[in-house]
C-alpha cells in the first residue's frame, strides 16, 4: 500500500516549479480552455528534475545518475522526459529519455498548439533511455521507439511480463554518453 501527496504552491521566485509541486495545465501551457490567453510555453521548464535516487515502482526500476550527469540536467544541458504506451490500454512499454539540449532548445518558447512541443522534443538529440518493454519486443522495435542503437538487457521485471533495458545512442556526445553509462540501475518489485 503506497501513499503519496502532492502539494500546490505558487512561488514568487519567478514562478519556478518546485519538486513535488502540481502544475496546472494553464501553467504548463496545455490548457484546453478556449478563453486561455497563454498560447506559448517554455518546454525546458517542464523536464523531469534531478533527484538523489529515482524510484519508479510502476516500472519496477530504481536508479541513480552520476553527480556530473545530474549537474548537466540542472544546467539544462540534458532534458529528462518520459514516454509510455497509451494509458487506456495494457502497458506495452514505458521508459525515461535523456536528451541533449542546445542553448536554443533550452531557451525555446513554443506554441502549445500546432505541434510546437512535439517539434521541440523531436529536435532533441537522444543520449539514452532506461525502461521496460513487453517481453519478446524485438530490439529493432526498441531501437525505433527509443531512438537508440545499443541496448543492454538489465533483467526481467518482478512480474516477469517485461524486459528491462538500458539503451544508448552511440552517436551521442562522448562525454555525455560516458557519464550516462555510470548510471546505477536496480530492478525492484513492480507495483
Regions found by a protein language model. Name each.
Residues 121-125, 130, 139-144:
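Surface-exposed helix/loop patches within compact recognition domains
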Residues 4-7:
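C-terminal motif of bacterial Sec signal peptides marking the signal peptidase cleavage site
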Residues 142-158:
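Short, surface-exposed beta-strand/loop micro-motifs that present aromatic residues
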Residues 84, 99-101, 133-136, 167-172:
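Short, flexible beta-strand-to-coil junctions
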Residues 10-65:
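N-terminal, intrinsically disordered, polar/charged segments of Gram-positive cell-envelope systems
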